[in-house]
């Protein structure tokens, strides 16, 4: 029996794809690059925003332009991450039911830590015990570090914890 459930955020609890696409395309268009379709962005997500921007930018982009574009994306996305993002149908009810049954929940994402915490607080305040996002001092999923951090935060044990996600990266986690 599971007493703890840790969820991925993007594509699992929240539909963030339109805001991610808008953020990437804002950065690309400001630099005169071709913008990307929502389907292209869907294929690029899962390994964190650094990988997302690396894939979205032209292949020959030098490291200086990449670093500036990544910083611009982080600023833009953090300021606009709730414009079109919505929880999937039934997510709030699921989290409410898990809480009522005494099952602890948390969120783990490769998205930057500041945005993860802001989204979790805005959409799921009181429904999850916390959120862990990507940070420079920890490897991203599929490395287990963020999930293990969430488990420590919740006082959870491996054999009674379920991790739920939507991507190959989540499967490898």
What are these language model-derived features?
Residues 1-43, 54-57:
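Active-site neighborhood of HAD-like aspartate-dependent phosphohydrolases
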Residues 3, 101-104, 160:
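Structural signature of beta-strand start/N-cap positions in the alpha/beta core
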Residues 6, 13, 87, 105-108, ...:
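Conserved SAM-binding loop
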Residues 19, 48, 93, 114-115, ...:
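Short alpha-helical
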Residues 24, 91-121:
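Substrate-recognition element of Asp-dependent hydrolases with the DxDx(T/V) motif
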Residues 27-28, 48-62, 119, 150-151:
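Helix-loop "lid/cap" segments that line or gate small-molecule binding pockets
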Residues 54-93, 101:
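Metal-dependent phosphoesterase signature
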Residues 83-86, 112-173:
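Substrate-recognition "cap/lid" segment bordering the active-site pocket of phosphatases
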